[in-house]
Amino acid sequence: PQVKIHPAQQHSLEWLQARAGVVTASEFDNIMTPDFEARTGEMRQSYMCQKLAERWTGGSLPGFQSIDMEIGQILENEAIPSFEIEHNVKIQRVGLVLTDDGRFGASPDGLIEQRAGIEIKCGRPDTHVRYLLGRSVPDEHLLQVQGGMFATGLKEWVFMSYCRRMPPLIVRVDRDDEI
């Protein structure tokens, strides 16, 4: 499928405007359950009202950002070169990738040589250890990873959990077209 790539830096005003009214991979949990069933009720309705309001006004409000999230964004700048060197690949940073119709999108942390996307989480050390012990994409990020593949049309995604002074968790995920 055809996609549109917006080069705007993630979290910038231009990026927020490009996301206005778009159902994005990072928010798929508002419309689907972890078992990949359609959500019903207040959560879905609230999210869909937000997206409609964004379409009508042409703007998207910045979301809440904790200190841990800010630190995570900084650490992504360490994680990407680390992954590139370790795997001998080049990662293209992108702001937003939209489906051709503009209804769905994803903001991957990068595209690996146009064949896979990458989602990097740089959380707290205790969270990273939990991810390492699980050795798979944590349930709370699975919809985002599958949503990224849906929005970009890619068939492969890499989930990486990165924490300084610890081994990274790297999980390759294939697209599940049954979702």
Task: Locate each region found by the language model.
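Residue-level preference for nonpolar/small residues embedded in alpha-helices
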Residues: L75-E76, E140
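Nucleic-acid nuclease catalytic cores
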Residues: M69, H87-P108, I112-I179
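Active-site region of the double-stranded beta-helix
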Residues: F83
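Charged, glycine-rich intrinsically disordered N-terminal tails and low-complexity linkers that flank
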Residues: P1-I74
